[in-house]
Regions:
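Duplex nucleic acid-engaging cores and interfaces of nucleic-acid transaction enzymes
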Residues: 1-180
């Protein structure tokens, strides 16, 4: 998994919103906002030089939206963040399962099942996996959004900047749209 995380930013991807934003020349704006080094002015003033109707960037809002997509993808591709979230899933995650159909089956014990990942027994994981494979269960591992966002913010934030609120929104977008 660690090797996959390291390789992930270089892996060939389908055309994402971030890819389109990079094609429009918004990567330098994203890098500037993510660096969190600008302490005066406004985001609109930073984005104004990137407005280019020929490339499809019609307004500062378009430029900021594209830069936000790039930042969110950068966050989601970061190997250290993915490793921290994986640790969080192992220590604070909850394995859940519920019935996928109305039929009664040998998996009825797992029709409304929740157990912390750190305490789950191996045979239960195998049973849930088997039930999911057979189409009798839906299952997954979840963690609290607040814990995941705290880990992401810990890795991303560098200090006080005019782009802090914007980068925070990008962290939430990365978590909800790309990682979770």
């Amino acid at each position: 998994a660690e090797v996959e995380d390291i390789y992930r930013p270089y892996k060939q991807k389908r055309r994402t919103r971030a890819t389109i934003a990079r094609e429009k020349g918004l990567a330098p704006l994203a890098k500037l906002l993510l660096s969190q080094t600008v302490t005066s002015g406004t985001l609109e003033a930073l984005a104004a030089p990137y407005v280019n109707e020929e490339k499809g960037v019609m307004s500062t809002d378009d430029a900021l939206a594209g830069a936000g997509d790039i930042i969110a993808e950068t966050i989601s591709d970061d190997a250290a963040i993915r490793a921290a979230l994986r640790r969080l899933y192992r220590t604070r995650g909850v394995l859940w399962a519920k019935a996928a159909t109305d039929e009664d089956s040998v998996y009825r014990l797992y029709y409304d099942y929740r157990e912390p990942v750190s305490r789950v027994q191996g045979h239960r994981v195998l049973a849930v996996n088997r039930g999911e494979r057979e189409g009798m269960l839906k299952a997954g591992v979840e963690i609290e959004d607040a814990l995941a966002l705290q880990e992401i913010r810990r890795a991303v934030f560098r200090g006080i900047s005019i782009s802090n609120a914007f980068v925070n929104a990008c962290c939430e977008d990365a978590w909800r749209r790309l990682i979770e």
